[in-house]
């Protein structure tokens, strides 16, 4: 448990110290942002900072720091180190610069920015790559929640269409299209902050539950500094690609332009982009700790056997 708290403290300190170094390196100033200068009422809309943060958090987080971190717990508490230092020195830097570069280029997408600096060939490559990536991620982020809703409905005694995976997939896809085609502050700006708060509350509830229940203990890094993977899978490089969201994910660069078009000031970038990534790192750290704590051994993540962690 001590190692978890240390990693949590390092993440928080990293936001204020290294995050500020990153911010100063970029050099935000008082120039007009795209949201103020363009302000078309659709994609370019000034939104309050707290809302920017929560929307950005949900855009980059979602299921990623939960599923990935829980799978990362298969390697044991050593995953805490990757989440902590990956977030501070890689993920936060990536998210900040991808968002601020977009802001400096009138809210351009990652493909457009790539084309500006690397030419039209790489721009088209990035466009294809982004579309394929977004389809894959969108599929997971549709099937995952739909499956959870079906499970909840089944457990509550519901039947018929409410327990149909296809039904909930259609509902989610309809929501996708509505949120995409109308003004960003009409749906995303109103609903996403609520979901973002729910994501944070859920993580806080998990860690409070672990701390207040003496039956569970978070194992220490120094007691298990090595791979605990039940299949003997090595830490390098499999743990690093398993835990992407929550440490570093290139996918975030496709999402950052959304909020880059809604900032009132460049000085909000530190909190919105770097801060949201640190918050995602904290969420991933909590779920990784839950994975290490709630299961008898790390193999329990595969078998579903819950018990007291070995420390």
Regions found by a protein language model. Name each.
Residues 193-196, 202-253:
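Helix-loop-helix junctions that connect adjacent transmembrane segments
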Residues 2-19, 72-102, 111:
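Extracellular loop-to-transmembrane helix junctions
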Residues 38-51, 57, 103-134:
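Transmembrane-helix boundary/entry motifs in multi-pass membrane transporters
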Residues 210-221, 276-308:
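Extracellular/periplasmic helix-exit of transmembrane alpha-helices
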Residues 101, 112, 143-156, 172-195:
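Membrane-water interface regions at transmembrane-helix termini and the short interhelical loops
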Residues 138-156, 163, 167, 180, ...:
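Hydrophobic alpha-helical segments and their helix-loop junctions in multi-pass secondary transporters
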Residues 70-74, 98-102, 242-268, 272-277, ...:
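Helix-loop junctions at the membrane interface of multi-pass solute transporters
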Residues 10-66, 268:
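Membrane-interface "cap" regions at the ends of multi-pass membrane proteins
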């Amino acid at each position: 448990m001590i190692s978890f708290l240390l990693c949590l403290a390092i993440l928080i300190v990293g936001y204020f110290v290294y995050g500020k170094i990153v911010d100063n390196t970029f050099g935000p100033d008082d120039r007009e942002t795209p949201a103020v200068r363009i302000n078309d009422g659709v994609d370019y809309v000034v939104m309050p900072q707290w809302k920017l943060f929560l929307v950005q958090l949900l855009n980059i987080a979602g299921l990623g720091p939960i599923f990935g971190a829980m799978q990362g717990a298969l390697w044991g508490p050593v995953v805490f180190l990757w989440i902590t230092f990956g977030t501070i020195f890689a993920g936060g830097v990536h998210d900040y610069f991808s968002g601020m570069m977009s802001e400096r280029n009138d809210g351009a997408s990652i493909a457009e920015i790539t084309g500006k600096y690397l030419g039209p060939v790489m721009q088209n490559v990035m466009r294809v790559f982004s579309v394929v990536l977004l389809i894959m991620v969108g599929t997971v982020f549709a099937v995952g929640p739909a499956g959870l809703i079906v499970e909840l409905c089944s457990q509550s005694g519901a039947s018929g269409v409410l327990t149909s995976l296809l039904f909930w997939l259609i509902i989610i896809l309809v929501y996708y299209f509505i949120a995409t085609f109308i003004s960003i502050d009409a749906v995303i700006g109103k609903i996403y902050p609520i979901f973002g708060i729910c994501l944070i509350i859920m993580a806080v509830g998990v860690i409070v539950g672990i701390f207040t229940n003496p039956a569970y203990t978070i194992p220490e890094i120094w007691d298990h500094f090595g791979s605990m993977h039940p299949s003997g899978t090595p830490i390098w490089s499999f743990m690093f690609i398993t835990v992407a969201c929550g440490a570093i994910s290139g996918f975030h660069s496709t999402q950052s332009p959304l909020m880059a078009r809604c900032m009132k000031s460049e000085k909000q970038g530190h909190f919105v982009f770097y801060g949201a990534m640190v918050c995602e790192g904290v969420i991933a750290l909590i779920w990784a700790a839950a994975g290490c704590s709630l299961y008898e051994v790390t193999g329990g993540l595969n078998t579903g056997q819950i018990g007291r962690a070995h420390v």
